């Protein structure tokens, strides 16, 4: 057992809780399904990763930890859509500064994460298309990020 995670089903402010047995041991949910020759999507939540092709989850906001397992040039970081969350904003800014490919969610997406998008009627194919169109790197990522963040 590496970790376990629970999700609130109601309107709780605390939506997820993750308990890791060894906090220094970075494991990825879904690593056994990854094709390293293809683009690898890295999400925060295991549930989110199940709706994307070739995706893993970190079970926290440290998505860059996936680069310990995969070629950085193959990775796309898919953070939750939380422009007011200081931790997420800080992690995203660091990822941009370190030249990762990163998804900057468009304004039309009001949902917090991929799971919420599915619950609100988006198909996995629609989500994959949005992610493909709104993946940026370097200066373009920085420009999109400045417009996206709210802190």
List each language-model region with its residue ranges.
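Replication-associated primase and helicase/ATPase modules
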Residues: 42, 70, 74-79, 89-151
């Amino acid at each position: 057992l590496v970790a376990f995670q629970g999700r609130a089903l109601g309107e709780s402010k605390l939506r997820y809780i993750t308990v890791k047995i060894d906090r220094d041991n970075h494991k990825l949910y879904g690593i056994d399904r990854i094709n390293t020759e293809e683009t690898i999507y890295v999400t925060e939540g295991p549930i989110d990763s199940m709706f994307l092709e070739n995706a893993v989850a970190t079970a926290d906001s440290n998505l860059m930890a996936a680069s310990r397992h995969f070629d950085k040039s193959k990775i796309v970081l898919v953070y939750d859509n939380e422009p007011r969350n200081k931790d997420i904003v800080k992690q995203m800014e660091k990822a941009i500064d370190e030249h990762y490919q990163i998804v900057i969610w468009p304004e039309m997406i009001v949902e917090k994460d991929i799971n919420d998008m599915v619950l609100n009627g988006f198909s996995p194919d629609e989500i994959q298309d949005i992610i493909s169109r709104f993946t940026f790197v370097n200066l373009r990522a920085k420009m999109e990020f400045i417009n996206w963040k709210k802190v």
